[in-house]
Structures are given as C-alpha cells and as structure tokens.
Amino acid sequence: MSLSKTKNPALLAGPGDEAKEKVQAALELLHKFGSAFKVDTAGFSFHPESPECDKIFGAYLKNVKHVPTYSSAKTLTSVGGRILYAATCQYVKLTPVTNLTGCTLWEHGWGQNLKCYHGEGMCRKKNEIEMAATSESGVAALKEGRGAVEINRWGRQVVKITQENYVICMEDLQSRFNQPSANSCGLSFSDSDKARSAMENATELTRSIFSQAKMDHLLFMPICCYCNYGGKMILGRQLCKLTPFSISGTEGLREEDVSPVQAVSVRHPAVFVFQCCNATGGSKGKTSCDFKISHADLLQVLNLVRKMWLEVMGYPMPIHFPRFKWSPSLRVKNALLPEGSVNEDENPFGLDNSEDEEEVVPPSPPSPARKRTRTTVAEVHHKKKKKIVLESSEEDE
C-alpha cells in the first residue's frame, strides 16, 4: 500500500507530512479489516469519497444476513462505510474538516407538540392533493379509503385526498404545498399522528437496542444523502427528507409472541425513513439520489459496525456523533438558476472565418464650433462713417 497511490485527502485536516503518516496508518488498519473479511485492499487510497470502507462493511453485512426495513442495500453499506471511515480517522488521530459520519444526534424536544429543526412548534395546515383517477397512486388511495373521486375545476375526474393532520415548519405557513419558503428548514409531515408514532418507535427501539444509552430525548439520524455528503451545499433542502412509514402486518400480533425489540413495532407500527434531501417521488424532470434508510436499520448498522470493530480490534470502537444545531446555512435554497447542456462544437454560430474583417475607420473628432459675434446697429454706422472718411482722405492726396 504505497502512498503514491493515495489521492489528496482534501477533507482531512493537518500538516502535509503528518497527515500522510496518519493516512498510511489508516491504510494499514483497513488492510487488517480487509484480511479479516477477505476484501482486497491493494488499491485503497483512504479518500473520503472512495467506497473502500463500504466494501469492507458490505462483506461483513453479507455474513450477518440482515433483513432491511424500507432500506436499500446500497445505503446500508454506504452508511456503515461512513461510520467505519470516521472511526478509523479517530483511531489514527486524523481530524476531518467536516462530519464524515453524515449522522448526528437531534434533540427534537417532541412532547405534546411536534417541533421542526428550528426548535419551534410545527403548524397544522389543511392540505388537499389531487391525483389522476387512473394513476397508480390514485388507485392505491381509493383502495386504502384515503381518497374520493371528484370533478376538479377543469372538469377532469380526479382522486382527491384531504390531509387534516398535515403539519409544516412555521416558516411555511403562507407557502403553497411542497414549496418551502427561503427561511424554511423543509420539515413537514402529511400525518402528524403517524409521525408521533414513528418518534415513539424510534425512542423505544433505541432504548431496547442500546439499553445503557441515555437517548430518550435524542434522535440518531443521517443528515447527508449522496448529493450533499462531505459538507456540500445543494439547491433545495439541505437535510435528509424525513418521512414516517407504516409497518404493515402487525394486526393480531401480541407483544409476548415476539422479541422485545420487535414488540416495539407492534406497539408503534410506524418507522422513520430517511431519503434524498430532495426526493421527488418520481416527478418528471427532477432527479434525486437513491439514498434510503430507516431509523431501525440505521441503529442496526451502528450496532453491526461496532461488533465488526470489536471482532477485529478486540476493544470498543472509538466514534463521536455531533449534536445537531440549527444554522441558517441549513435553510432551503430556492434559487432558480438557469440550466443548459454543454455544446462542444467548434463553430456553433456558423461564423465564416474566410471573410476578411472590414477595416473600421475611427470617426474624426468634431470641429470646434465657431463663435458667432453679434453686431449692433451703432457698430454698423460707425464702420460706414469710418469707410467714408478713409475714401475722402485718399482723394485729397
């Protein structure tokens, strides 16, 4: 593992030579993990944006055979790789310039009222959604009894869903649906009751898995998707989209028939799912990354990375997750910037280069205006009298 193969660790702080020595120590540590789980580490560079730690955790995850809940396999390995990378940095005393775990601890303060990322109470606002009667979402809404067929103002048949428990950030009270204001944190829930159930699930699940941790008032969550990892600023929301998903099939289950961890989801059949900051839900003309992980799987990923570290190193993993603090930089960026594709044609405007350029003669400077003198009547008589005197004097000579 030669340092000549390493990329410039732009997200890592420290003097050049000292940072290189620490990167070399980190590469040796990853080689140790790779040997334990049969991962080739010959070309590793320990760059923050390289998926090297993802490969190591992915190999470990395959042996565990974890069944995800609303999470993609790619996101599970990515988040596990981020945590392993941050732990390795802390082990070799290499200080990143940003939070490379991509995760944080949010002191949500939820009680009787739900609060947004500003720390203020969320506002309830009635919201109505119209969908085509033949669309997949419209048919699903009718089957679930969430919508009704109506004729809209354009005379079209639509499925109308009325969200009575829709809550939004206080800064979006005067904004239209799904169009957050410039001061918004971007947090909203279509069903406040389901969101509350998901938060109760998260609290009790954390208590069940990490029984010694005092986390009743904190939510462990990712804040970076693939779009803004590493402290990047993007258009739109700056924090992962937080959505409560229902856990189906819990009807008829008794808590005593399942494990204590599973019993949490029987009592509170909803779970938070974190997605791309600007997840579009399949909207045309918009793109989003495929980041998707549930809170339950996020806890399991942290647990598995800790177990993996303990198996290889023989002692607990060093890791630190910062507290979430609201900052104006996390507000929704609503700038409308012009887009366009790059055209590499040499002559896109059809200029004829064979034609000689006409010589441009600079215009001559304007001549100064002559000053017109004004002659009075007295001056005219004086000149005539002077002329007569001159003529008479010539005759005398």
From Swiss-Prot:
Example of a GO cellular component annotation carried by this entry: viral capsid
Binding of Zn(2+) 1 occurs at 116, 118, 169, 185
User: Subcellular localization, per the record?
Assistant: Host nucleus
Question: Does the UniProt entry include the keyword Zinc?
Answer: yes
Output the InterPro entries linked to this UniProt entry: Ad_DBP_C_sf (IPR036367), ADBP_zn-bd_sf (IPR036368), Adenovirus_DNA-bd_a (IPR003176), Adenovirus_DNA-bd_N_sf (IPR036362), Adenovirus_DNA-bd_zn-bd (IPR005376), ADV_DNB2 (IPR037540)
The molecular function terms in GO held by this entry are: DNA binding; zinc ion binding
Map out region (C-terminal arm, DBP binding) in residue numbers. Answer: 335-397
Q: Does the keyword Chloroplast apply?
A: no
Q: Which UniProt keywords apply?
A: DNA replication, DNA-binding, Early protein, Host nucleus, Host-virus interaction, Metal-binding, Phosphoprotein, Viral DNA replication, Zinc
Q: Give me the ranges of the annotated region Disordered.
A: 338-397
Here the segments flagged for biased composition (Acidic residues) are 342-360
For region Flexible loop, the annotated ranges are: 129-161
Binding of Zn(2+) 2: at which residues? 225, 227, 276, 289
| One GO-annotated biological process of the protein | DNA replication
What is an example of a Pfam family matching this protein? Viral_DNA_Zn_bi
Domain remark in the UniProt entry: The C-terminal arm bridges DBP molecules together, thereby creating a chain.
Quaternary assembly:
Homomultimerizes on viral ssDNA bound to pTP. Forms a initiation complex with viral polymerase, pTP and hosts NFIA and POU2F1/OCT1. Interacts with host SRCAP.
Its annotated function is as follows:
Plays a role in the elongation phase of viral strand displacement replication by unwinding the template in an ATP-independent fashion, employing its capacity to form multimers. Also enhances the rate of initiation. Released from template upon second strand synthesis. Assembles in complex with viral pTP, viral pol, host NFIA and host POU2F1/OCT1 on viral origin of replication. Covers the whole ssDNA genome during synthesis. The complementary strand synthesis induces its relese from DNA template. May inhibit cellular transcription mediated by the interaction between host SRCAP and CBP.
Record family assignment: Belongs to the adenoviridae E2A DNA-binding protein family.
Q: What is this protein called?
A: DNA-binding protein
Instruction: Name its species.
Output: Snake adenovirus serotype 1
The uppermost taxa in this organism's lineage are: Viruses, Varidnaviria, Bamfordvirae, Preplasmiviricota, Tectiliviricetes
Q: Give the gene that encodes this protein.
A: DBP
